[in-house]
């Protein structure tokens, strides 16, 4: 990067981290009050960026510091999030169901991978989900499951994240292809199983939430909390079922 390009890069990163407005105009106004947003906008939109290469260099830099260095004891979280927006012309913007709001919202839907361990947490990579005007994500060119598998391939084959375990919620755990993809790299996974899923137990199909009264649990202390746990491998698309409840609320996990 040239001197001016480096200055623009520092301006943009500083604005994203500390500015109240994340737009180019807002960043130029707050970080460089005497500067014009035209030069910064040109740097962002017209410079020939390789976003993947830049992100990989960011991750490499994080490994040079003990407090952010990843390890096999860490976890990779796969999830998605809807970022609410107002602009109608933003790339991939549309109406997506937001679980935190409990209703559809206008925004951009990102499927992302996140690294976390006992000392640090930071994003690894992301893919933007676009519905292509389809009401059902199954009709889209790429589903969220497809994007999640792409992320896993990138992290395992290009980045080389050593974390031994992937974590995801019941929605992603519902896709047996995603589970198989994780296992193909010799990695473990932990995911929630929906309580209405049918599993075979004692030669009979039962709902997961009906198992609790038929199993013997074992108490375990985790972070000063007492959980009643039980594990067993069941024939439900090769899921490994783990039922846990705390001693007060009996909440299944």
Segments and roles (model prediction):
Residues 11-13, 110:
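Non-membrane alpha-helical segments in proteins
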Residues 135-210:
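Domain-level cores of phosphate- or acyl-group-handling catalytic modules
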Residues 46-124, 130-132, 242-248:
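Active-site-proximal, Lys/Arg-enriched surface segment
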Residues 38-42, 100-163, 252-253:
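Electropositive, glycine- and tryptophan-enriched low-complexity nucleic-acid-binding patches
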Residues 4-5, 16-88, 154, 185, ...:
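Electropositive nucleic-acid engagement tracts
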Residues 1-10, 138:
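Basic, short loop/linker segments at the boundary and entry of helix-turn-helix/winged-helix-like folds
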Residues 119-126, 133, 137, 188-253:
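An anionic, glycine-rich sequence signature occurring as long contiguous blocks
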């Amino acid at each position: 990067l040239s001197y001016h390009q480096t200055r623009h890069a520092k301006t943009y990163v500083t604005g994203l981290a500390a500015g109240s407005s994340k737009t180019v105009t807002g960043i130029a106004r707050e970080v460089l009050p005497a500067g014009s947003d035209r030069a910064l906008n040109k740097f962002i939109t017209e410079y020939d960026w390789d976003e993947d290469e830049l992100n990989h260099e960011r991750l490499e830099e994080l490994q040079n510091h003990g407090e952010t260095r990843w390890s096999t004891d860490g976890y990779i979280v796969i999830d998605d999030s809807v970022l609410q927006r107002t602009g109608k012309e933003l790339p991939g913007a549309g109406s997506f169901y937001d679980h935190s709001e409990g209703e559809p919202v206008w925004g951009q839907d990102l499927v992302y991978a996140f690294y976390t361990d006992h000392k640090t947490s930071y994003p690894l990579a992301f893919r933007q989900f676009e519905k292509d005007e389809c009401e059902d994500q199954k009709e889209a060119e790429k589903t969220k499951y497809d994007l999640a598998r792409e992320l896993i391939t990138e992290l395992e084959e290009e980045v080389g994240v050593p974390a031994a375990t992937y974590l995801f919620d019941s929605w992603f755990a519902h896709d047996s292809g995603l589970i198989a993809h994780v296992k193909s790299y010799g990695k473990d996974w932990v995911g929630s199983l929906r309580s209405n899923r049918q599993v075979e137990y004692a030669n009979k199909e039962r709902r997961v939430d009906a198992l609790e009264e038929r199993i013997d649990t074992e108490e375990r202390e985790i972070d000063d909390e007492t959980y009643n746990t039980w594990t067993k491998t069941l024939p439900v698309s090769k899921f490994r079922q783990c039922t846990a409840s705390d001693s007060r609320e009996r909440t299944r996990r």
